[in-house]
């Protein structure tokens, strides 16, 4: 058995936003055609309440593939060197069920979630839409900024976060890649 292992750096190198947005467009199209099997996630709570193990299987009809995302959610990890969400995505051969690959789930989730938003924005937003409001300043804010840049030319970006300090850090770190200044909003409504 030969299993490919792809860490976070490998995922980010291979699954770029310009690759993932069209993939998500295709996956959403397959979902609407009934070519996807995606049971509800299964959650197991640890008896002491310290965390959750989540299992999320799925099958895609085109290209035929299936796999499983296994993730832990450990709220006690906030403020430690460990992420609160960690896991892997496992892919299997459709014909024989053999394990093919184990990939870092955090990086896939960050990119895929935003790429789905990018695909939907591309399909539904006006061509001249260029204002972006981000509610939150974490990982998803950064990947959503990249996804929106992929599908629309941005003219204005506003961010609100529960922590103004985090919003300011996000604006500093992301302004160059945004191509426009990032404004800090005082409230989610203002953003």
Where are these regions (language model features)?
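Conserved beta-strand segments of alpha/beta enzyme cores
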Residues: 2-4, 156, 181-183
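Structural motif
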Residues: 134-135, 160, 185
